[in-house]
Amino acid sequence: MILILLGPPGIGKGTQAAVLSDLLKLQHVATGDIFRKNFQENTPLGKESKKFINKGLLVPDEITNQMIADYLSQIVPHSNFLLDGFPRNVFQAQFLETFFTKSNLHLNKVIYFNAFKQDLMKRIEGRRICSHCGKVYHLDNLPPKIEGICDKDQKKLIQREDDKPNTFLKRLKVFNQETLHLVEYYRSKKQLFEVDGMQNIQQVTQKILKVLETEQK
């Protein structure tokens, strides 16, 4: 099974990705992790990406596509994975489609988490992450056992720069400019399943599992 998760920043894709990958025994492929791996290993693609990131620019599609393809090529024999953070636009989606065809892979479903801007703003204000392991919490919906401290490794929780209001609004603008076209692209291919991303974690998970179960019958 291959799934793609789409949705605006702050919607909780990472949380759902972790839950679904565990329940469905899928490998969680997160774009951010792939970039970090390339940075740490100082690969040619990692070096090239850093040039753009250090200037505050988006990494060109060609570099991102190649980085993702290189990584996916290593896990193709398993062919059960969930993509979180890729594709971000139609060009990347078309590249991925070609890669899947060449690799004899089948995309089962694209899950799109939708939400209103004001609801996202409220959710993002309460989001905190562990400064060490990256585990995500929410002050209202998913608080740590001890205020300000990670349950997993007892490190300090922080608010990411990306989650601060001004930065978040910029990220949302980029999403609306690029990724909304991608939603329509997958909708036209009848591959899209839309879910209200503002429901609680369990409700969202159950709706996704139900539609996947129906698809497989």
Swiss-Prot record:
Pathway(s) the chain acts in: Purine metabolism; AMP biosynthesis via salvage pathway; AMP from ADP: step 1/1
Q: Quick one: which residues bind AMP?
A: T31, R36, L57, L58, V59, G85, F86, P87, R88, Q92, R160, R171
Q: Which UniProt keywords apply?
A: ATP-binding, Cytoplasm, Kinase, Metal-binding, Nucleotide biosynthesis, Nucleotide-binding, Transferase, Zinc
Name its cellular compartments.
Cytoplasm
Biological processes annotated in GO: AMP salvage
The entry describes its oligomerization and partners as: Monomer.
Function recorded in the entry: Catalyzes the reversible transfer of the terminal phosphate group between ATP and AMP. Plays an important role in cellular energy homeostasis and in adenine nucleotide metabolism.
> Could you identify this protein by its name?
Adenylate kinase
Which species is the source of this protein? Phytoplasma australiense
Protein's gene: adk
